[in-house]
């Protein structure tokens, strides 16, 4: 992502209404008579790896607007049309298309069909409506039972009609816990997010999980690779082994408690902790990933400021992903050649100060251009670096690619630039 995305994510309006993405270097250069670059419309076939652009079950539409600060993709698939805000979301959605395909293949097997019959005749059939919620379309925000199970696991104790006994309520809780654990196991074994907001995927996961939990269906991840060229390219995720383990073993309520403890341990106040934990822009997965990333910044002061901004300004899944991926880039720098000392804030934007004094901006930014707001923000960074009378080194690190013009402008102002720190689906 780039600075305009940050304006949306962290509310840095005015300072960061900025930049976007430019065509690949092969595109015609900006008009030399213009002081700044225009926001372009990219071509998917030119910027994406071939296996991401097209596969047996999907094609990314050619037009890729950059108006919101992220590459805006539309995916036509055998299972419907999916939107993807940004490079990272594109990778996730394409991978989910192939997970849906594999799950549908499983649902056609005789073993699966027999398991459904067994489930229908078994003691858990009455609980089916408690743990499944039919879905007909992709939504950016989980709804109904899916949202309940995904974000408010602590409310599980309240399930049940008012005239039912406590023992009956506890029995229903046990049923839901067993089902959701099975569903998490299936999703994670396939390398996909069990709390994905892709409702088509959730419906397929529901079916397989129900047959497995209530009907005795034997599910093996070994039989469900995300196949083909696309699968080979997409099986690498940002999730660490510790995140995968936590998602597999812990229900949302436990993750919430762990995240609360971790946030308090790194200096986040009680108010900001609860505000962050209650922000539904963050799924259990993105919430936990963000906290783990911040926790990995051992010894870095003022991490609480990033949490404050994320909790206050994030309003959707793309915002949460931005925070997760940006904090992951911070972790890469901290464990690599730029150990960090503290996080400073320019309004709501976190800026890293390294132990050697280097001022570092590290962002998930798809493809960045030189715009008026980028110029304004550059000036803000230069002022920060000049504080104390001694100019500090300046470094900008982004996940995607910078335009040649942007690199030139930054370098001429004394910045060191580093792009493609996590190029994702880009060629």
Put a short name on every predicted segment.
Residues 157-206, 210-223:
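Extended amphipathic alpha-helical segments with heptad-repeat/coiled-coil character used for oligomerization
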Residues 37-162:
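Cationic, glycine-rich low-complexity segments
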Residues 262-349:
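Acidic-basic catalytic patches of nuclease active cores, encompassing PD-(D/E)XK
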Residues 328-388, 394-396:
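Conserved catalytic cores of phosphodiester-cleaving nucleases, focusing on short active-site segments
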Residues 7-15:
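Bacterial N-terminal signal peptides
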Residues 399-427:
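Domain-level recognition of nuclease-like catalytic cores that cleave nucleotide substrates
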């Amino acid at each position: 992502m780039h600075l305009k995305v940050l304006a949306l994510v962290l509310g840095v309006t005015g300072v960061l209404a900025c930049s976007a993405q430019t065509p690949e270097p092969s595109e015609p250069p900006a008009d030399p008579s213009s002081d700044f670059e225009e926001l372009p419309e990219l071509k998917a076939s030119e910027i994406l790896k071939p296996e991401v652009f097209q596969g047996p079950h999907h094609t990314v539409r050619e037009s890729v607007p950059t108006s919101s600060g992220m590459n805006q993709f539309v995916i036509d698939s055998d299972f419907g049309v999916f939107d993807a805000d940004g490079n990272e979301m594109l990778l996730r959605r394409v991978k989910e298309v192939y997970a849906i395909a594999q799950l549908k293949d499983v649902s056609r097997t005789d073993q699966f069909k027999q398991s459904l019959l067994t489930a229908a005749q078994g003691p858990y059939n009455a609980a089916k409506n408690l743990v499944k919620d039919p879905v007909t379309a992709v939504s950016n925000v989980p709804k109904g039972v899916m949202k309940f199970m995904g974000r408010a696991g602590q409310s599980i104790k309240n399930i049940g009609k008012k005239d039912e006994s406590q023992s009956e309520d506890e029995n229903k809780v046990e049923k839901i816990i067993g089902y959701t654990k099975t569903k998490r196991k299936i999703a994670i074994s396939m390398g996909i997010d069990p709390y994905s907001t892709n409702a088509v995927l959730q419906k397929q996961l529901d079916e397989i999980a129900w047959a497995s939990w209530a009907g005795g269906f034997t599910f093996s991840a070994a039989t469900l690779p995300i196949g083909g060229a696309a699968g080979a390219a997409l099986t690498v995720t940002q999730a660490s082994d510790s995140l995968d383990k936590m998602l597999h073993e812990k229900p949302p309520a436990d993750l919430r408690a762990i995240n609360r403890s971790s946030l308090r341990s790194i200096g986040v106040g009680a108010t900001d902790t609860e505000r962050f934990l209650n922000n539904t822009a963050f799924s259990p997965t993105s919430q936990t990933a963000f906290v783990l990333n911040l926790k990995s910044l051992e010894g870095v002061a003022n991490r609480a400021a990033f949490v404050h901004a994320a909790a206050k300004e994030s309003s959707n899944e793309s915002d949460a992903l931005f925070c997760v991926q940006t904090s992951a880039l911070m972790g890469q720098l901290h464990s690599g050649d730029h150990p960090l000392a503290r996080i400073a804030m320019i309004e709501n934007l976190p800026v890293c100060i390294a132990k050697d004094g280097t001022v570092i901006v590290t962002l998930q930014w798809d493809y960045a251009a030189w715009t008026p707001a980028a110029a304004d923000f550059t000036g803000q960074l230069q002022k920060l670096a000049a504080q104390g009378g001694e100019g500090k080194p300046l470094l900008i690190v982004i996940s995607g690619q910078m335009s040649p013009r942007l690199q030139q402008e930054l370098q001429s102002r004394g910045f060191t630039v580093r792009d493609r720190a996590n190029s994702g689906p880009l060629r």
